[in-house]
């Protein structure tokens, strides 16, 4: 890993940590989701997994540790892998519409996967799953809408910098 890539990843982790902590008052609206998924969609799965693991670990010092941290890392990792394969192995067209749909659907699926993991850990009862999932649907919708809005308003414009295709120039 060269210095430019390491610096870019460290910067992405810092952005994700700061925004995750500061946006924690808005349920499930996170720049982190979009950055992890866009890295995976743009064939940088290794970077996606690194940013995911580091961000979740560091933010847990501020927001609290628990079994859910592992679930979040696994969930975002799984969604990153799924998007990586859809766009890079199965050849899904990479345009703004498909990326918006991918980050939106991934935001919704995030809640489903987290709920499944919690039910298997806590009780394994189908009724507890239905109750937990019904309670999480408004947050999942919020996550989906937030991901799409963040992608269209911010990430789309910065995508080439996030993926390292463009670099910021020094002003001398």
Language-model regions, residue ranges each:
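Hydrophobic alpha-helical transmembrane segments
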Residues: 6-11, 38, 46-53, 70-74, ...
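Structural signal for the C-terminal ends of transmembrane alpha-helices
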Residues: 41-46, 82-91, 156-163
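Hydrophobic side chains within alpha-helical segments
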Residues: 23, 33-37, 75-78, 118-121, ...
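Transmembrane alpha-helix boundary and packing residues in multipass membrane permease domains
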Residues: 37, 56, 80-84, 115, ...
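Lipid-exposed faces of alpha-helical membrane segments in multi-pass integral membrane proteins
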Residues: 11, 15-19, 54, 58, ...
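Interfacial aromatic-anchored transmembrane helix boundaries in multi-pass membrane proteins
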Residues: 17-31, 53-87, 127
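Membrane-embedded alpha-helical hairpins and interfacial helices in multi-pass inner-membrane proteins
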Residues: 66-70, 92-172
């Amino acid at each position: 890993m060269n210095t430019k890539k390491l610096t870019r990843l460290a910067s992405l982790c810092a952005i994700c940590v700061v925004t995750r902590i500061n946006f924690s008052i808005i349920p499930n609206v996170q720049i982190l989701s979009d950055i992890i998924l866009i890295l995976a969609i743009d064939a940088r799965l290794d970077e996606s997994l690194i940013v995911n693991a580091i961000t979740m670990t560091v933010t847990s010092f501020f927001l609290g540790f628990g079994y859910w941290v592992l679930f979040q890392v696994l969930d975002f990792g799984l969604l990153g892998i799924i998007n990586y394969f859809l766009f890079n192995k199965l050849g899904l067209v990479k345009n703004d519409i498909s990326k918006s749909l991918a980050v939106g659907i991934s935001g919704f699926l995030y809640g489903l996967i987290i709920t499944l993991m919690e039910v298997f850990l806590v009780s394994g009862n189908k009724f507890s799953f239905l109750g937990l999932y019904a309670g999480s649907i408004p947050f999942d919708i919020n996550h989906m809408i937030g991901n799409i809005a963040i992608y269209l308003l911010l990430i789309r414009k910065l995508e080439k910098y996030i993926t390292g295709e463009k670099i910021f120039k020094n002003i001398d």
